[in-house]
């Protein structure tokens, strides 16, 4: 594995002379016809091809690739099962591309599959992705009647300073091949995908952020890029800024000035009647006060529709920014870092489904790994005791209360309670508990103590007070509560989503029932 790591880092040691070099090329279709108006970039300069399909610009000192924004009318080109819209910059000056038209033309309807935080730290984690996530993604793609394209939302691996898991990047990349998951997957960098190994300082690596992204680039290609499907312009960007090179904790969510300028140029070639989707790792909801984030949100608001897709939090949330742009924050594919089958907010390991028609999102759902699409909620008794040998949290609400975790609920969803077959009333959304503090059950706690009870009480993660406990006591933005008229009644909770679909749960969890939380046990050989 170490050999793979060294080889990949060495592969990016290109053109480190620090002087600008002309980059030229021609873009044609498979019939040899030159293509005009194709957007080409090195991540800094943005230009388009002329009537003869030609482009030219001076490369930026820090640029590693030349690449194009894939037009909606052309197929996603694959290399070894992965999208490849780029070529590595070398001492050459000419970089030509050939695009293959889609047989049926532009795809008006398609599905985006959002995979947040696979976050593999070791071979067992990769094996769980291989055995659980990948086949589930493939099954979803097979069932979908429209073309499917996946997008990762960062933290492909779990590097953290001296705990360097970047050697797993080539392995997880292999598991993410289109043949393995049933669709091509575009990548977004996360804060745990950074390279903490020493990298030469110079014009090509002028900031900690640029130096730390080199391993990810070597494996997956450009960091800031765009592509088009139907009437949608899709952008992936790095939104992690590192303050120093030698401390993995010294980062914050934001965009650099260079990135904002690159995005401004990229969007200048997009018609205002299109929808723009921005894919990042850290939710922009976390950094709304940043001037560069506000600049990005302002640019996006100029289009007919705009959406943001993010991960990072290991919980599920829907958020609307002040300018009306909706952000989807997706639960992690790895849940609580593969220790269980659920995220810290009780949302199961899984991924998001975004269905698009024209320039509109026409449907959105969360798909739990290993479960049917209708698995959308879990119900608890208000006095239940959860956990295991490490700790046993008890809900303080009383036996006449029930709580429902509806992991993709929004304000336009209805959550109803039936007692003995008769409609009793609507559940009330609980006020979301803070991220820090609230580490034990209380009458004001909206957290999912069934999930927390498994991770802290059974597994023992974050059991002792410390910096990691909050990771396993995530806030829950979708917990509902109801007072039963008859605590002894047979209870059924019926959820109706914004499309009128109904999801039903008639099982109330009253204790440490953890068949759905416990991960499978695999025997993984050291060779694998």
Predicted features and spans:
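Structural motif
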Residues: 21-36
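N-terminal active-site segment of His-dependent metallophosphoesterases
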Residues: 22, 73-75, 81-164, 487, ...
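Hydrophobic beta-strand segments
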Residues: 38-41, 66, 415-417
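Short, acidic Ser/Thr/Gly-rich low-complexity loop/linker segments typical of extracellular
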Residues: 44-56
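A short, solvent-exposed beta-strand micro-motif common in secreted/extracellular proteins
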Residues: 61-77
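Extended active-site neighborhood of metal-dependent phosphoesterases/phosphodiesterases
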Residues: 72-76, 85-88, 161-264, 268-270, ...
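Binuclear metal-dependent phosphoesterase catalytic core
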Residues: 325-409, 413-422, 477-506
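Aromatic sugar-binding surface patches on proteins
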Residues: 436-482
